[in-house]
Curated annotation (Swiss-Prot):
Residues at the catalytic site: 248 (proton acceptor)
Protein name: Protein nucleotidyltransferase YdiU
Residues the record lists as binding Mg(2+): 249, 258
Source organism per UniProt: Salmonella paratyphi C (strain RKS4594)
Annotated family: Belongs to the SELO family.
Keyword Lyase: no
Binding site for ATP: 86, 88-89, 109, 121-122, 172, 179, 258
NCBIfam families on file: adnlytase_SelO (NF040880), PRK00029.1 (NF000658)
Length: 480
């Protein structure tokens, strides 16, 4: 089957990009590709059979229909207007036409200098490329909207970060790379007609059912707000900290995008800061819902030339509604509740308080709770707490709450184990794969990808265990 590509972004939004080709890496070689995703997209296996160079995966060749561009956008970074940003090292190669008529961006990250590189070198390093591939695939298999990773190319090109590393490229796929920052760019350039063109493009291609509706812009922004709310809930309930929620890292489609200093909670710490460059804690774990609303308000501001302010404020309420409604639903599922009762939040917050005091492992606590039997007065989870009396008191109230519903253990446990993962991408697991890959051993990288495809399957190895002490102290920054 021949892959078919189009260039809708290039053809319809000429003010938003610069056309250019990737800059090649030295001794580029394909070290991993996503076989399952490739099969789903009917990508010929022959494209991955690269024995001399890295082919399209290293930007050495283009497939028919590809028209590479680097996109321009702006944004607020750490709450401050940063001006023009853009794809400083990534190139949108083209948009794959799928059988259902939709498209999928092929975006090559680490593809070299662009007009938007500012002080950067246009490169991505092997370390950050591996982290993004693992994170995006982990999130996908957790059921969380995200970009996807299709391939990784390593090289011998030296790249200077805190230390000297080697350059790499990631082929990232997404339904769209449209960001809040695209709208901010033209709003602050006082070009409202181009802001409206972006909105028209989004509606035409992603919400075509509203094209001819008079209130199409309001409906569209309401949906952007609601999707953002649901995404943040998924992050919070699985214990994911993005680390750098700048407006240019926010997706119009409600996707998790731009994996940098991310982290999954180990010990439950609501104030967890994954990014050691975030000195003020703006993007700490428990502040993500507030930051997302702030970012939506910045996006709303760009839409004021063609949407009434009252309508924008009502749309922003959709974010809060989606956040609260979806959070309640998801946390009840995590606790094994099938109905909503007035004291559920009290019970949940008591558990969180106990976990915070004890430094309980976030994922393991909920996973172990999912094995609870109503008739059993004890739980293996009890042994993980120092204050057994406090846990016993909470557990008695929890079991009493379970007994208010006529649901047997098997059905409840099944529900809980579908939303409480046994495996998440802990930073130390990613680092172990990176360390091996930097020595030329890709086995752990490949195996970890396999493990992350089954996050809801119980395991008795270290992929599902608490991290070693050194693994809790890993520092992650925006450097990539």
């Amino acid at each position: 089957m021949t892959l078919s590509f189009t260039a809708r972004w290039r053809d319809e939004l000429p003010a938003t990009y610069t056309a250019l080709l990737p800059t090649l890496l030295k001794n580029a070689r394909l070290i991993w590709y996503n076989d399952k995703l490739a099969q789903q997209l009917a990508i010929p296996a022959s494209l991955f059979d690269v024995t001399n160079g890295a082919g399209v995966w290293g930007g050495e060749t283009l497939l028919p229909g590809m028209s590479p561009v680097a996109q321009v956008y702006s944004g607020h970074q750490f709450g401050v207007w940063a001006g023009q940003l853009g794809d400083g090292r990534g190139i949108l190669l083209g948009e794959q036409l799928l059988a259902d008529g939709s498209t999928l961006d092929w975006h090559l990250k680490g593809a070299g200098l662009t007009p938007y590189s500012r002080m950067g070198d246009g490169r991505a390093v092997l370390r950050s490329t591996i982290r993004e591939s693992l994170a995006s695939e982990a999130m996908h298999y957790l059921g969380i909207p995200t970009t996807r990773a299709l391939s990784i190319v390593a090289s011998d090109t030296p790249v200077q970060r805190e230390t000297q590393e080697t350059g790499a490229m990631l082929m990232r796929l997404a339904q769209s790379h449209m960001r809040f920052g695209h709208f901010e760019h033209f709003y602050y350039r006082r070009e409202p007609e181009k802001v409206q063109q972006l909105a028209d493009f989004a509606i035409r291609h992603y919400w075509p059912q509203w094209q001819d509706v008079p209130e199409k812009y309001v409906l569209w922004f309401e949906e952007v707000a609601a999707r953002t709310g649901r995404l943040i809930v998924e992050w919070q309930t699985v214990g994911f900290s993005h680390g750098v929620m700048n407006t240019d890292n926010m997706s119009i489609l409600g996707l998790t995008i731009d994996y940098g200093p991310f982290g999954f909670l180990d010990d439950y710490d609501p104030g967890f800061i994954g990014n050691h460059s975030d000195h003020q804690g703006r993007y700490r774990f428990d502040n993500q819902p507030s930051v997302a609303l702030w970012n939506l308000q910045r996006l709303a501001q760009t839409l004021t030339p063609f949407i009434e302010i009252d309508a924008l404020n009502r749309a922003l309420d959709r974010y809060q509604d989606a956040l609260l409604t979806h959070y309640g639903q998801r946390m009840r599922q995590k606790l094994g509740f099938f109905t909503e009762q007035k004291d559920d939040n009290v019970l949940l917050n008591e558990l969180f308080s106990l976990m915070a005091r004890e430094g309980s492992d976030y994922s393991r606590t909920f996973r172990m709770l999912s094995h609870t039997e109503q008739q059993s007065a004890s739980s293996p989870l009890r042994d993980t707490f120092i204050d057994r009396a406090a846990f016993d008191a909470w557990f008695d109230r929890y079991r009493a709450r379970l007994r208010t519903e006529a649901v047997d253990d098997a059905l409840r446990q099944q529900q809980m184990q579908r939303v409480n993962p046994a495996v998440v991408l802990r930073n130390w697991l990613a680092q172990r794969a990176i360390d091996a890959a930097e020595q030329g051993d890709m086995a752990e990288l490949h195996w970890l990808h396999e493990v992350l495809r089954q996050p809801f399957t119980d395991r008795d190895d270290d992929y599902a265990s608490r991290p070693p002490e050194w693994g809790k102290r890993l520092e992650v920054s925006c450097s990539s």
